[in-house]
Amino acid sequence: MSLAMTAFRMMAVALVVVVASSTTWARSLEGSSSPVTSLTRGRSLNKRAAFDPSCTGVYDRELLGRLSRLCDDCYNVFREPKVAMECRSNCFFNPAFVQCLEYLIPAELHEEYQALVQTVGK
């Protein structure tokens, strides 16, 4: 067997080892391999799980997203960890949300946002 052929085989074996170990490593990053996890691919079974359970009104992802983005923007302005949590508490019906609204949103849109809070928080 020539030296070139031996080197080629060693490179092929090394490549197989790298691919196999990276696949195993990627699987370990996915977390648990329980049947539920594999069926849902890690997604929540409860579609409301990402939002405050105190929001008992109309479930509308777009509305909740708009309200949540306001809280995110407020956090990005003030960089206080509690701002984002307080803003979302009680389904956006709180003084922190009102302060964020007054600071970030033009006054002519305040009533619209208050109506959104009423819609999702009934």
Curated annotation (Swiss-Prot):
Q: Which SUPFAM superfamilies match?
A: Crustacean CHH/MIH/GIH neurohormone
The region annotated as signal peptide is 1-26
Tell whether Disulfide bond is among the UniProt keywords: yes
Q: Which GO terms describe its cellular component?
A: extracellular region
A biological process (GO) of this protein is:
glucose metabolic process
Q: Which GO terms describe its molecular function?
A: neuropeptide hormone activity
- Compartments it resides in: Secreted
State the superkingdom.
Eukaryota
Keyword Oxidoreductase in annotation: no
Question: Could you tell me which InterPro entries the record lists for this protein?
Answer: Crust_neurhormone_CS, Crust_neurohorm, Crust_neurohorm_sf, Hyperglycemic, Hyperglycemic1
- What are the alphabetically sorted keywords of the record? Amidation, Carbohydrate metabolism, Cleavage on pair of basic residues, Disulfide bond, Glucose metabolism, Hormone, Neuropeptide, Secreted, Signal
Q: Which residues form a coiled coil?
A: none
Query: Which residue pairs form cystines in this protein?
Result: C55-C91, C71-C87, C74-C100
User: Which Pfam families does the record match to this protein?
Assistant: Crust_neurohorm (PF01147)
PROSITE patterns per UniProt: CHH_MIH_GIH
Q: What does the entry state regarding organ or tissue expression?
A: Produced by the medulla terminalis X-organ in the eyestalks and transported to the sinus gland where they are stored and released.
Q: Sites of the modification Valine amide?
A: V120
- Family classification: Belongs to the arthropod CHH/MIH/GIH/VIH hormone family.
Role noted for this protein: Hormone found in the sinus gland of isopods and decapods which controls the blood sugar level. Has a secretagogue action over the amylase released from the midgut gland. May act as a stress hormone and may be involved in the control of molting and reproduction.
Designated name of the protein? Crustacean hyperglycemic hormones 7
Q: Which organism is it from?
A: Penaeus japonicus (Kuruma prawn)
The taxonomic lineage of its organism, from the top, reads: Eukaryota, Metazoa, Ecdysozoa, Arthropoda, Crustacea
